């Protein structure tokens, strides 16, 4: 009986913790944040004229289109931006 109860508790905990949360870098890559539900991409935005210097980083749901002035790079693994 105790084994059944313990098994039920373990299965419940595992099932409740199945939702994966993505972690994305903030502007300074030493710091990151856990993305809220629905934000399943990390992004990095930078000006086309200065591609080595990111202007903004974070979590996003859909990768924006780049323009002539601004470029976006999106990815979907932890701290990939």
From Swiss-Prot:
GO terms for biological process, alphabetical: killing of cells of another organism
Disulfide bonds: 24-42, 35-59, 63-74, 75-80
Entry keyword set: Cardiotoxin, Cytolysis, Disulfide bond, Membrane, Secreted, Signal, Target cell membrane, Target membrane, Toxin
One Gene Ontology cellular component: other organism cell membrane
Signal peptide positions on this chain: 1-21
Tissue: Expressed by the venom gland.
InterPro entries assigned to the protein according to its UniProt record, in alphabetical order: Cytotoxin_Cobra (IPR003572), Snake_3FTx (IPR003571), Snake_toxin-like_sf (IPR045860), Snake_toxin_con_site (IPR018354), Toxin_cobra-type (IPR054131)
Alphabetized SUPFAM superfamilies for the sequence: Snake toxin-like
Places the protein is found: Secreted; Target cell membrane
Pfam families named in the record: Toxin_cobra-type
GO molecular function ontology, one term from the record: toxin activity
Subunit structure: Monomer in solution; Homodimer and oligomer in the presence of negatively charged lipids forming a pore with a size ranging between 20 and 30 Angstroms.
Function statement: Shows cytolytic activity on many different cells by forming pore in lipid membranes. In vivo, increases heart rate or kills the animal by cardiac arrest. In addition, it binds to heparin with high affinity, interacts with Kv channel-interacting protein 1 (KCNIP1) in a calcium-independent manner, and binds to integrin alpha-V/beta-3 (ITGAV/ITGB3) with moderate affinity.
Family statement: Belongs to the three-finger toxin family. Short-chain subfamily. Type IA cytotoxin sub-subfamily.
Name the UniProt record assigns to this protein: Cytotoxin
Native source organism of the sequence: Naja sputatrix (Malayan spitting cobra)
Upper taxonomic lineage: Eukaryota, Metazoa, Chordata, Craniata, Vertebrata
């Amino acid at each position: 009986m105790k084994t059944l109860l313990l098994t039920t508790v373990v299965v419940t905990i595992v099932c409740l913790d199945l939702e994966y949360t993505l972690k994305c870098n903030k502007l300074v890559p030493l710091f990151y944040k856990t993305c809220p539900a629905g934000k399943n991409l990390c992004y990095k935005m930078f000006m086309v004229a200065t591609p080595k210097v990111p202007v903004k980083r974070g979590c996003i749901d859909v990768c924006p289109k780049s323009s002539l002035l601004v470029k976006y790079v999106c990815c979907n693994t932890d701290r990939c931006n």
